[in-house]
Amino acid sequence: MTVQPTTIGIVGARGHTGAELIKLIAAHPQLQLVFVSSRELAGQRVAEHSDGYEGELRYESLDADAVAAKAADVVILALPNGKAEPFVAAIDASRPQTLLIDLSADYRFDPAWYYGLPELTRHTYAGQRRISNPGCYATAMQLAITPLREQLAGPPQCFGVSGYSGAGTTPSDKNNPALLADNLMPYALTNHMHEREVSAQLGVPVEFMPHVAPHFRGITMTVNLWLQQPLTREQIHARYLERYAHEPLIEIVDEAPWVSRIAGTQGVQIGGFTMAPGNKRVVVVATLDNLLKGAATQAMQNLNLALGWDELTAIG
């Protein structure tokens, strides 16, 4: 008996994350990519833009109603912030059973949507067909803070540095290699959307200072944590090992991880664990690929979780 594949479409596939999603879908034994929407690439073969995809599928320029009419089992929205609502409304109206995964910030504060950071929230998944993918910085911050969340004596201070792929493909200062050369570009130093996101998810105020660097991909998140009671480095290291012992995508390392070692990989490295005198302050460093665990890989984890498959299918 032949098992019918689960059909999937991507809206907003021109971007860097869309390209990574296509590779993951191509590697998934139970998924069939049936449409890829991009105004800029409409008419061009997907295989010409993705080295992981083989086939004759072409990019299309699809509005919200056209996406809903495709009747795919799964739709992933990889659109800029503020662009998801028409697609969500059209699918809600005609195909409410569709599994819809939104990679933007648009629904991260909506309690009707499952907030999908599997290592921290999979126990709250209850069959929701609307999944909001966390932000890339927000993923790094939450994974770095959570093992010590109950010990915090004040707001964590998070210094984040991202490769310029995090600024998307629309030209701006933050993804201009000429302006970024020999430079580190701070921006949105208070009230960044990921600061609000992490504060809401963890239930504690978080202070976040993002920067863009000249490298293409990968995030380094350096997190300063003040503790209520002194803890030794060994105790803290053990807490992280215990918390993530059964999480194959999270590796606890001894030294502070390097972003150059995580770029292009699916997981997260957390390490450093540097103590200040008195043992009531620790600095923790997390690294991840913003396009993978910060976006596409996490979306695939959420898809697998929602459909009852092994969470790491196509991820490895």
Swiss-Prot record:
Entry-linked InterPro entries: AGPR_AS, AGPR_type-1, NAD(P)-bd_dom_sf, NAGSA_dehydrogenase, Semialdehyde_DH_NAD-bd
Keywords: Amino-acid biosynthesis, Arginine biosynthesis, Cytoplasm, NADP, Oxidoreductase
Annotated EC: 1.2.1.38
Annotated GO CC locations: cytoplasm
Keyword Amino-acid biosynthesis applies: yes
Gene Ontology molecular function: N-acetyl-gamma-glutamyl-phosphate reductase activity; NAD binding; NADP+ binding
Residue intervals passing through the bilayer: none
UniProt record, GO biological process: L-arginine biosynthetic process
Catalytic site positions: C136
Bridged cysteine pairs (disulfide): none
Pfam families xref list: Semialdhyde_dh, Semialdhyde_dhC_1
Primary residence: cytoplasm
Record field: catalytic activity: N-acetyl-L-glutamate 5-semialdehyde + phosphate + NADP(+) = N-acetyl-L-glutamyl 5-phosphate + NADPH + H(+)
Pathway: Amino-acid biosynthesis; L-arginine biosynthesis; N(2)-acetyl-L-ornithine from L-glutamate: step 3/4
SMART domains: Semialdhyde_dh (SM00859)
Stored Gene3D superfamilies: Dihydrodipicolinate Reductase, domain 2, NAD(P)-binding Rossmann-like Domain
Listed NCBIfam families: argC (TIGR01850)
Role this protein plays: Catalyzes the NADPH-dependent reduction of N-acetyl-5-glutamyl phosphate to yield N-acetyl-L-glutamate 5-semialdehyde.
Name listed for the protein in its UniProt record: N-acetyl-gamma-glutamyl-phosphate reductase
Species annotation: Xanthomonas campestris pv. campestris (strain ATCC 33913 / DSM 3586 / NCPPB 528 / LMG 568 / P 25)
Lineage, top ranks: Bacteria, Pseudomonadati, Pseudomonadota, Gammaproteobacteria, Lysobacterales
Name of the coding gene: argC
